Amino acid sequence: MAKQQDQVDKIRENLDNSTVKSISLANELERSFMEYAMSVIVARALPDARDGLKPVHRRVLYGAYIGGMHHDRPFKKSARIVGDVMSKFHPHGDMAIYDTMSRMAQDFSLRYLLIDGHGNFGSIDGDRPAAQRYTEARLSKLAAELLKDIDKDTVDFIANYDGEEKEPTVLPAAFPNLLANGSSGIAVGMSTSIPSHNLSELIAGLIMLIDNPQCTFQELLTVIKGPDFPTGANIIYTKGIESYFETGKGNVVIRSKVEIEQLQTRSALVVTEIPYMVNKTTLIEKIVELVKAEEISGIADIRDESSREGIRLVIEVKRDTVPEVLLNQLFKSTRLQVRFPVNMLALVKGAPVLLNMKQALEVYLDHQIDVLVRKTKFVLNKQQERYHILSGLLIAALNIDEVVAIIKKSANNQEAINTLNTKFKLDEIQAKAVLDMRLRSLSVLEVNKLQTEQKELKDSIEFCKKVLADQKLQLKIIKEELQKINDQFGDERRSEILYDISEEIDDESLIKVENVVITMSTNGYLKRIGVDAYNLQHRGGVGVKGLTTYVDDSISQLLVCSTHSDLLFFTDKGKVYRIRAHQIPYGFRTNKGIPAVNLIKIEKDERICSLLSVNNYDDGYFFFCTKNGIVKRTSLNEFINILSNGKRAISFDDNDTLYSVIKTHGNDEIFIGSTNGFVVRFHENQLRVLSRTARGVFGISLNKGEFVNGLSTSSNGSLLLSVGQNGIGKLTSIDKYRLTKRNAKGVKTLRVTDRTGPVVTTTTVFGNEDLLMISSAGKIVRTSLQELSEQGKNTSGVKLIRLKDNERLERVTIFKEELEDKEMQLEDVGSKQITQ
């Protein structure tokens, strides 16, 4: 017991005499955490605003520099660089150093490479670099500009971790690396995310700032267009770009570069560039996952055809899918489109500062001024030292006999130095230089060289003094140096900036506005084709296999419109349905198309009789005509809310069907033709405007068994084209047809015979259009109406198309090409021939 008490007393005595202090745990935690946080911020996660480098990047570059791994020297093993950096400057894991070095050698990670790598340094698919013992590296040519003049006291050096080496606190950085290559990092309580930019644009921005220090971020935006990422892709110009230029924070929307290609049997989305920091393999896996989960439909196949030439990701589209709509879904659901958050946080004088674009350029510019001043002072000191020595050498050369005598008489060097000082006022440095001078330097030629060198040094010294005294001259020199960098390393943008495109994705925002041909077969198969799919042929041409159809099917409708036009489908039952033109999948001339029932909710026994396009509902009318001659006029704006499920467009008797619908302007003359070759002409204002669901009135008087087979207006031309089923047709001036009241019998226009066959269509034209004729076999002949001579009434006409046995002319379409605005217009002038 006594022994234990002695031990307790001894412990108390030791505690009383110890240096242990009582402290607050909360205070100690706060202090330790702040030390750790600042260490991470300053020494690990954030780049210096002056050279754009974190300590580990700077150490790798400087380690390669002092190791002689320059761009014009042979490659050396990566392990050599990693080992040197780890042993001298960065006492951390070798993989951290190697990963840093590898990233600076990856063209998909850095916009401007700082390491010239030889071997496998990873891929955009997420493949890791080969082991450091296999790969080789050296500094890139551009990296040498970061280290340029580092041996001329341009930056401060500090001791390394063990005090045996010196390392730079910042690099001279002859180009704005922070903005050129960007940076990203996560510190404690803060992070940085700086996008890369185009070097040429940055230099233009710096020159603008030098010339006009008061320039605004809007003015900088005129030369620095926005980010320029290593992987290219498209950048959608949004307020986010302006925001980070002004405040240092914002969002950049990056969208993959995708082209729609036509393969042999279907369309394909071909991805050639993807957003920065997107893993291609992960992207493909995500698309496959969405297809399996049935969240995205319409993809037939996906394959990666990427090579050394670049990315090529092919996504084959199913035949019944609109490629633009599928692309829209992929942009929404995958990383084909991403947002890059910009937070331009960097170290300024050792503290983290959020910089806007102008401030980042100003910090770099201040650094360049500091580098130039320090370099100039260093050069000035060296030149002044050399000038001082040259002055002594020239004195000695001019008094060489006395100098030689003094040296010969002197007992030692110090006595010679003292004598030279006394005799010629040479200080110790000059005297030592004289003693070290070789005899050959005493020749006349060498003396002249010394005099020339002295004169050049004098001029250079004066220039250095001017530079140090004149900031304008400093800025001029910096501009010249930046221009040299631009001339040598400047390049074109990789990322294209898209203006006037919304970042909000909708189907039509991705669909190019272009003119297309819309076709529909008798059985209701729809197809969208390019307007250049048909070649002009002369009258009587046999045609090409223009529009393939299924067996027992033929073409019934064809028109040209914009991809952004509304398409209105009018059916024989008097209903109307509406979709957008781009909703019809793109196809080839020889494709069969897709059923209309896939796009509109048409009934099984319902047939589409007219297909019209509308861009503006504010002006104009729809003019309806039934098979039995009932007509009606209704304003376009009554059809603006029509959807794909359809609505009633006209009412009529049970034994009647809707024949055709055309657009009118309110002051047109209407021409209605019959199967027996009669035409009635009357003014549309004879009909009052009726509601959408109203019934009409009689427009033409028909005999029993006679039906309407033509509907057109005077605004479509001054000639009347009449075409028979056997390919016989003619042109007649509309002046030959008198203006009558509606519901008249009309005037005979085509003499119907066995040679002509029943009249297929009667329509007005100008005479300078192209005529597209579609046969029952799906062949198309395009010929100019200018080749067709004008004839009188009640004649049979001439041969327009050569038809084979059992082949008949089924549809006629007029094709207009407006040369002034390059827009293609097409007037749908006929309907499928009435079966006799």
UniProtKB/Swiss-Prot annotation:
It catalyses: ATP-dependent breakage, passage and rejoining of double-stranded DNA. GO terms for molecular function: ATP binding; DNA binding; DNA negative supercoiling activity. It is found in: Cytoplasm. Residues 46-510 form the Topo IIA-type catalytic domain. A motif (GyrA-box) lies at residues 537-543. Keywords: ATP-binding, Cytoplasm, DNA-binding, Isomerase, Nucleotide-binding, Topoisomerase. Its EC number is 5.6.2.2. It is an enzyme of class 5 (isomerase). Its main location: cytoplasm. One of its GO terms (cellular component) is chromosome. CDD domains: TOP4c. SMART domains: TOP4c (SM00434). Pfam families: DNA_gyraseA_C (PF03989), DNA_topoisoIV (PF00521). GO terms for biological process: DNA topological change; DNA-templated DNA replication. This is DNA gyrase subunit A.
